[in-house]
UniProtKB/Swiss-Prot annotation:
Belongs to the universal ribosomal protein uS3 family. Residues 38-106 form the KH type-2 domain. Binds the lower part of the 30S subunit head. Binds mRNA in the 70S ribosome, positioning it for translation. This is Small ribosomal subunit protein uS3. Part of the 30S ribosomal subunit. Forms a tight complex with proteins S10 and S14.
Length: 213
């Protein structure tokens, strides 16, 4: 049975960039683990802000953290109070200096990670999974997605046996390298167990082969 490669790993250096950008020889494993802990900590702390992407750069003992969010106001706060509080919390927890940059996601309806989290939130509120998928697909197509595919896996609608249901509209060419495929994953914690939600959104072709900025 064929398995699907991660759309980002498949396109790294072609039309997708690395989300951790640093170089190390002896501290490589420590940095990888620290990046994972930083991402997990921020995701848990700012889940309501709709964090789409976290990019990490390291230089001169300082960590530069770039956050893409649907609600920058929640992250920054009034007069930058919240972002300064976050910087101090990160320094206290990880023992390093942080600089933070926040960019707004203009169209969250076609951002795969935010779409996946939105579906997971609906499933936790007991919305029927088919209705949640169809509503999300039509919204993404309305906002300019050329194709979208959603899969939900787990004990759907409280069924005894776990299964996978999927819904697709438009084209989603996963094997075409020049295709700009956005991918997101989220988990819905329901009374029956965890339901995994995966989203692929096709946004057109990248013709000039430049790595995304």
């Amino acid at each position: 049975m064929g398995q699907k490669v991660h759309p980002y790993g498949f396109r790294l250096g072609y039309n997708k960039n690395w989300q951790s950008r640093w170089f190390s020889k002896k501290d490589y494993a420590n940095f990888i683990y620290e990046d994972y802990k930083i991402r997990s900590y921020i995701k848990k702390l700012l889940y309501s802000a709709g964090i789409s992407k976290m990019e990490i750069e390291r230089a001169g003992g300082k960590i530069c953290l770039m956050l893409s969010t649907a609600r920058p106001g929640i992250v920054i706060g009034r007069k930058g109070v919240e972002i300064e509080k976050l910087r101090l919390e990160l320094r206290k927890n990880f023992g390093q200096e942080f600089s933070l940059e926040v960019t707004e996601v203009r169209r969250p309806e076609v951002d795969a990670q935010l779409v996946a989290e939105n579906i997971a939130m609906q499933l936790e509120r007991r919305v029927a999974f088919r209705r949640a998928m169809k509503r999300t697909v039509s919204m993404a197509r309305k906002f300019g997605a050329e194709g979208i595919k959603i899969t939900c896996s787990g004990r759907l609608a409280g069924a005894e046996i776990a299964r996978t249901e999927w819904y697709r509209d438009g084209r989603v060419p996963l094997q075409t390298l020049r295709a700009d495929i956005d991918y997101g994953f989220a988990e819905a914690h329901t009374t029956y167990g965890i339901i995994g939600v995966k989203v692929w959104i096709y946004k057109g072709e990248v013709l000039d082969k430049e790595v995304e900025k």
